[in-house]
Amino acid sequence: MKFQKRNIQLVLILLLILNNCFINSQVENSKKEKVDVSALIQSYGSELFNYLNNWNKVEENNNKNNNNNNNNNNNNNNNNKNSKVKNDDSIVNTFSNYGNQILNYLNIGDGGEKQKQNQKEKENQSVFSKFSNNVLGLFNFEKTKDKKEDEGILPSIIKNIQDYVKWGKNENNESSGDKYPNFETQSSSFSHSPYGDIFGININDIIASPLLNEISDSSLNYLKQQFGLSNQIIQLLIQFRNTIIFAITFIIFLFTYLIIYYLASIGNSIVISFIIGVLTVFLWVIITLLFTIVIGYKKNGEKTLEL
């Protein structure tokens, strides 16, 4: 199967947009290093892969050691060791750790400094009060001692949307030329995002690239035939396709994290953390499929779902 760069971009769009939303969701404390979201994702992907790859081997070792548990001390030691490996690599712990990392990054988990400071007060609050406070955190515009904005998720996304409007110009309102290379053309006329990127690919380059602007006539005809869309609706899709894609993604993103904020209000047990971890992975899968289905059409109208 011929390898196509464009198919890779379909997946990277999701990573880039979520990275752009995550990377500046809030200003970190002076003593706290900025989170490398791409490294975080890769680390949990590796953990999950290692778990799936080693599960059978660990299970077999545990069964053998359990059968020989009373034979000698060596077997007992091996059993304890393998049981510990299974516990460390279990799917529950993997997703629970993932959920805890998400909570800590959003500054609403047990590891968040604000959560620790207000823990005693929140113990006396109802679940609804905790949920309300967490949701208000989405719109957080508090000032720190350094008089910097401690941004919530939504203010950060709003600023990112404002940045999208200005792609093509840098901070000095000048064309950025080809200082930041594009994935396909190795040149770019769009500004480098100050919010970070993944794999050296700028999110503004992707949004402004022909990838999002290319819905061919054959693809539109395919949609028209399958769903009976009128020419007027097709024209609206052409005109507002980028806005529609972004809006759907934003709604999915927002509702998912409202659920996470609610779960964080209930408590921070291993079950809650596990659900949050699974929910976050589910969010990634859904948005990846969304972009693949909406944009993934060849010019002959065939789907390009295989990556």
Swiss-Prot record:
It is a multi-pass membrane protein. Glycans are attached at residues 124, 173. Residues 60-90 are annotated as: Disordered. It comes from Dictyostelium discoideum. It is found in: Membrane. The keyword Membrane applies. This is Putative uncharacterized transmembrane protein DDB_G0288661. Residues 63-82 have a biased composition (Low complexity). The chain crosses the membrane at residues 244-264, 275-295. Keywords: Glycoprotein, Membrane, Signal, Transmembrane, Transmembrane helix. The keyword Transmembrane applies. Residues 1-25 form the signal peptide. One of its GO terms (cellular component) is membrane.
